[in-house]
Structures are given as structure tokens and as C-alpha cells.
């Protein structure tokens, strides 16, 4: 994209998608954390009326200035991350902005090694018109623009779950402070076939298991299945994944089969619930429960948004949902293995060419040898320069009203212990309106496999016995 095209896109975005301002007094929730929309006014000290009025006015002015300030330290950060103008953030609590910016933001990327197209004649018709046109003369996809937004939203869910699990919920991103653990998490999602949670891995697995052609848009179900299977393959991440299936029912017996190890200990588990809360729009009876899903401490967010345009929702205020938008194309995030030891201890198939074929799709991903990627000279240093890390964070808030959201979505929760699970269970069940997650003790048997002998317990009635 040249400068003129970039300027034109920014102009259009300014008029049609202006940065939202905080105009509500309702509290703001972000993945279980509450932020007051307005700072409490200081109590005036007893004094004469003229002095009190002057002091109060000055205090309110100072509060307003500190409340809309977006930098951590004016001397260390002259502008918001990614070159964005701090003046666009109107009246938002700075603590909320810091938290929002600390969430991992995955977007479209370009310039990565090609993802080969499927040779199936049906593959072209499965792509959108935009994807077909922009890849017409190319044998593979070097960008996921136009089809990868649900994959990127799924990466957001998985990356933020790992970040909270490893760094804690209170960890905050600082542009000028390198964090090795944070960089190692991002390296898992690098745009390279060697990265276990890369766009290449998602597309490859979607073709092999979910019936999704390379270049075809994923739905919530396919994204959840890929997250689960890729996490199972990369056990070093230390995260189990449970997927509810086709509905909003979470079966406790099946969940514990995933979450509880052989010693009876609960392992950190990501619960993914794919659901549909209406036909064209979200039915109002679900509104309060959907808001509550972002207010409980176990929340990892929601992947969904508009039809064929997924977003990653992390916050809510009243009927407004705040999200990170993947529809912004950036250069690829390169892959840097955490260390030479880690690079050589990966599974063997990461250092060779891999091919996946299913009955409906086929794709080939060429994986370069692990030793062709340089490892950092000092394993204690960050794997990435700040310029790379900053592409995975933003303070740019986007907002969507609940009545405008698509009803099909993927809800995500992280439970780390048995007690945490019980708290989550109470949280999703004790909501106003109709619940968006249903917890059942056991999965019912498939139709036709009901309990033997049940038919003998049914009383028979003849016509004479009817009253």
C-alpha cells in the first residue's frame, strides 16, 4: 500500500469509524476488571467560600487532565504506541487504556511464506470475491487479508489466555520495557510455519480436519476446533482446551476429562463455547448474560462481530462492547525460537516439509529447517525489538452496540483450578435473563442409545382407562 492509498483509507476511517469518546457514567468492564467511568470528585476541605471554589475548580481541572492522559510518563512516551495521536482518546480512564493496550492484538499480516492454494476445483468458489481477485495470479497466499479475521480473533483468545496464565492478569505492556516471557508468547503466533499457533498452522489444520479450504473464511466452530487441536499438539504451552461442541452446553463430565490429570489435579483449561444467540441479531433476552460473560474474572473475551467480519471483544460498558479489530494489515511477525535448545527440542515434523490432505481439501506448507532461523545470542534478552512487539498492542478503542452484533460467536473462559471452576460455574449460571452458557452434569446419550429397560417403565393406557 502506497502513501496515497494509506492516506485515503485513514480519511475514510476517520469519517466512518471515528474514535469513540467516553460519554457514559456507567462502569467499564474489561475481562473481569472493573473501571469507574469517572474519577471520584475530591472532598473539599473546610475553608472560606472563595478559597474553596478556587481549589475545587483547580482540583477538577487536574483530575480531568490526568484522566484523559494516555502516556505512562510524558518524558518517556511523547506519543501513543504505533504512532497514534493521544488526543484521540477522549475522557477514558487511563488505567482502562493501559489494560486495553496490554491485551494481545492479532491482525492481518502480509509478506509471509506462501500458504499454498488447494487444487480442489471447489476451493475457488469457497473464497470471497476479494480474496479471489487479490490472489488471482499467485499460487499461494502471502497475506491473510480478506479471510483470516476469525483466525486472528482465535489467536487473540489463545494468546491472551497464555499471557494471563504466564504473566498474570495485572501484567501491563510498556513499549520501552522488553519482557522476555511476553516475547516468547508472541513468538508462538509468528507468521511462520514453524510457530505452533501461526496462521499457517491454523489454515493447515482447518484444511485437514475442518473442511476449510486455504483462503476460505473460518467460522467460530472451525476456529475453536483448531485452537483445541493445536494446543493439544503443543503441550509445552501448558494449556488444556475444552470445546462445547455445536451448542452452548458445557458438560461437566467431559470437561473434567480434559481438565483433570491422572493425579486428580485440575490443569489450566480454556473453555470455548460456540453459540448463536438469535437469527439476525442478538435476542434481547440474552443481553445481560452476554455482558456478564465479560465481567466474570475468568473471561478471556469473545470472538465474533459482524457477518463474515470477526472482532475480538474484551470490554463492555452499558450496551456498548469494546473490541480489538484484526482488519488492519501489517508486515509479518517473524519467528524467533526462544533458544537453541527449544528450537532443537520441538517435534520432528516442525523441521520438515509437511503435507495435509482431507477428503474435501488439500494444502501443502513448506517448513524451513529450524537452524535457518537465528536464535538470540543472549537467551535472557527479548526475542523481538520493540517495533515488532508494538504491532501486537494498541490503545485504539473500537466500539459496537450489542444490537449491531452478529449472534454467532465464540465465548472464551480460563479456569485454573477446581475452585476457579466453581466460581466460573456460579458466574455463568447466576445471570439476569437467559444464560448464554448452560452447565450440565453429564452429556446425554445420543438418540437411539437411551438406557436399556426404560421402555419397560412406561405405563400403558388403553382407551377404556382414559378419563
Curated annotation (Swiss-Prot):
Catalytic EC class: hydrolase
GO biological process assignments: aggrephagy; autophagosome assembly; mitophagy; piecemeal microautophagy of the nucleus; protein processing; protein transport
UniProt KW keywords: Autophagy, Cytoplasm, Hydrolase, Nucleus, Protease, Protein transport, Thiol protease, Transport
Domain of life: Eukaryota
Compartments, as annotated in UniProt: Cytoplasm; Nucleus; Preautophagosomal structure
InterPro entries (alphabetical): Papain-like_cys_pep_sf, Peptidase_C54, Peptidase_C54_cat
Annotated stretches, region: Disordered: 32-93, 343-390, 429-467
Principal subcellular localization: cytoplasm
A Gene Ontology molecular function term of the record: cysteine-type endopeptidase activity
SUPFAM superfamilies: Cysteine proteinases (SSF54001)
Annotated GO CC locations: cytoplasm; nucleus; phagophore assembly site
Function: Cysteine protease that plays a key role in cytoplasm to vacuole transport (Cvt) and autophagy by mediating both proteolytic activation and delipidation of ATG8. Required for selective autophagic degradation of the nucleus (nucleophagy) as well as for mitophagy which contributes to regulate mitochondrial quantity and quality by eliminating the mitochondria to a basal level to fulfill cellular energy requirements and preventing excess ROS production. The protease activity is required for proteolytic activation of ATG8: cleaves the C-terminal amino acid of ATG8 to reveal a C-terminal glycine.
Protein's UniProt name: Probable cysteine protease ATG4
Gene behind this protein: ATG4
Amino acid at each position: 500500500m502506497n502513501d496515497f492509498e494509506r492516506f485515503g483509507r485513514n480519511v475514510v476511517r476517520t469519517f466512518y469509524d471515528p474514535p469513540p469518546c467516553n460519554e457514559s457514567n456507567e462502569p467499564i468492564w474489561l475481562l473481569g476488571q472493573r473501571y469507574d467511568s469517572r474519577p471520584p470528585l475530591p472532598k473539599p476541605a473546610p475553608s472560606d467560600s472563595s478559597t474553596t471554589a478556587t481549589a475545587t475548580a483547580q482540583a477538577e481541572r487536574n483530575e480531568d487532565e490526568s484522566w484523559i492522559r494516555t502516556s505512562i510518563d510524558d518524558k518517556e512516551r511523547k506519543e501513543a504506541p504505533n504512532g497514534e495521536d493521544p488526543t484521540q482518546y477522549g475522557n477514558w480512564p487511563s488505567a482502562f487504556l493501559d489494560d486495553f493496550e496490554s491485551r494481545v492484538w492479532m491482525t492481518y499480516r502480509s509478506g509471509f511464506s506462501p500458504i499454498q492454494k488447494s487444487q480442489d476445483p471447489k476451493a475457488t468458489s469457497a473464497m470471497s470475491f476479494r480474496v479471489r481477485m487479490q490472489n488471482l495470479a499467485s499460487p499461494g497466499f502471502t497475506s491473510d487479508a480478506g479471510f483470516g479475521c476469525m483466525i486472528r480473533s482465535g489467536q487473540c483468545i489463545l494468546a491472551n489466555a497464555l499471557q494471563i496464565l504466564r504473566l498474570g492478569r495485572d501484567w501491563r505492556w510498556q513499549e520501552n520495557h522488553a519482557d522476555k516471557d511476553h516475547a516468547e508468547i508472541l513468538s508462538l503466533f509468528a507468521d511462520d510455519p514453524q510457530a505452533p499457533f501461526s496462521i499457517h498452522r491454523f489454515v493447515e489444520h482447518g484444511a485437514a480436519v475442518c473442511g476449510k479450504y486455504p483462503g476460505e473464511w473460518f467460522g467460530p466452530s472451525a476456529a475453536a476446533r483448531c485452537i483445541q487441536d493445536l494446543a493439544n499438539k503443543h503441550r509445552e504451552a501448558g494449556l488444556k482446551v475444552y470445546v462445547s461442541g455445536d451448542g452452548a452446553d458445557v458438560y461437566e463430565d467431559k470437561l473434567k476429562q480434559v481438565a483433570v490429570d491422572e493425579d486428580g489435579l485440575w490443569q489450566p483449561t480454556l473453555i470455548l463455547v460456540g453459540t448463536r444467540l438469535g437469527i439476525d441479531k442478538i435476542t434481547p433476552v440474552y443481553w445481560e448474560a452476554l455482558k456478564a460473560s465479560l465481567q466474570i474474572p475468568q473471561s478471556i473475551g469473545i470472538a465474533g462481530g459482524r457477518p463474515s467480519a470477526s472482532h475480538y471483544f474484551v470490554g463492555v460498558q452499558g450496551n456498548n462492547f469494546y473490541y480489538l479489530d484484526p482488519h488492519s494489515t501489517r508486515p509479518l511477525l517473524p519467528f524467533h525460537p526462544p533458544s537453541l535448545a527449544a528450537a532443537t527440542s520441538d517435534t520432528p515434523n516442525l523441521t520438515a516439509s509437511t503435507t495435509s490432505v482431507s477428503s474435501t481439501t488439500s494444502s501443502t506448507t513448506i517448513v524451513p529447517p529450524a537452524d535457518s532461523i537465528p536464535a538470540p545470542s543472549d537467551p535472557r534478552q527479548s526475542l523481538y525489538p520493540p517495533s515488532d512487539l508494538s504491532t501486537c498492542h494498541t490503545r485504539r478503542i473500537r466500539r459496537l452496540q450489542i444490537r449491531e452484533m452478529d449472534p454467532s460467536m465464540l465465548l472464551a473462559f480460563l479456569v485454573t483450578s477446581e475452585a476457579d471452576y466453581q466460581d466460573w460455574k456460579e458466574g455463568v449460571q447466576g445471570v439476569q435473563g437467559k444464560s448464554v452458557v448452560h452447565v450440565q452434569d453429564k452429556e446425554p446419550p445420543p438418540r437411539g442409545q437411551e438406557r436399556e429397560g426404560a421402555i419397560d417403565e412406561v405405563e400403558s393406557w388403553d382407551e377404556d382407562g382414559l378419563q
